[in-house]
Amino acid sequence: MNKKMSLRMKLFVLITLVVIITFSSVSTIVSYRSIGMAREDAFALADEMSVKYSYEIRAELQAARVTSESLMTVFKTLIERGEADRDTLNTILQNSLRQKEYIISFCVAFEPNKLDGKDAEYAGQYPLYGKSGRYAPYWSLQNGEIDVEPLEDFDNDVWYAGARDTGGEYITDPFFYEVQGTPVLMTSLVFPIIIDGDFIGIVS
């Protein structure tokens, strides 16, 4: 009797272990497949979202490109006609910034004395003009507030030098720049202002 019970107990334990191992294996396989399916779904969703946002970003970049190129044409025309004064340019930039929600900042920067020959008169007149008096205001819009600050010592910065040296449209890689105290990830689209083959500045 004891031997029979012992044998039965051994069989029971053995069968139970087999069932447990089998169940565990099945659970592991199901879990593994579930993880795999979840990962595939995540990749598919990420791919779908990347396509969606890439189209949106491309559309916004194209809109910003058209706006910057249009401003460059307007400023070039004003300069050629002798009608480009600083107040007019500042007003155009402010109005454009308020009307274009996809743009957070505008910059128009000229070579020394290439706008009106009056850099010395405007030297140190902050916040529009820096120590040199060059026309290079950086207009930004953040939380509905427009702000301006002068750009200085920018001749070798990639966004300025790129357009100047190539003589054509220049697009920077995305970079962080502080706008009204807040770091913002942005891309600059820069157009050179060239008159009679002479580079005189940029619109960005």
Model features per residue range: what roles?
Residues 1-5:
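Short, Lys/Arg-rich, polar N-terminal cytosolic tail immediately upstream
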Residues 7-15, 19-87, 92-95, 102:
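Juxtamembrane extracytoplasmic/periplasmic/luminal helical "stalk" adjacent to the first N-terminal
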Residues 46, 62, 80, 105, ...:
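Short linear functional motifs in flexible/disordered or boundary regions
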Residues 56, 71-74, 78, 92-100, ...:
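Structured segments of extracytoplasmic/periplasmic soluble domains
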Residues 98-183:
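Extracellular/periplasmic ligand-sensing ectodomains of membrane signal-transduction proteins
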Residues 182-204:
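Conserved beta-strands of PAS-like sensory domains
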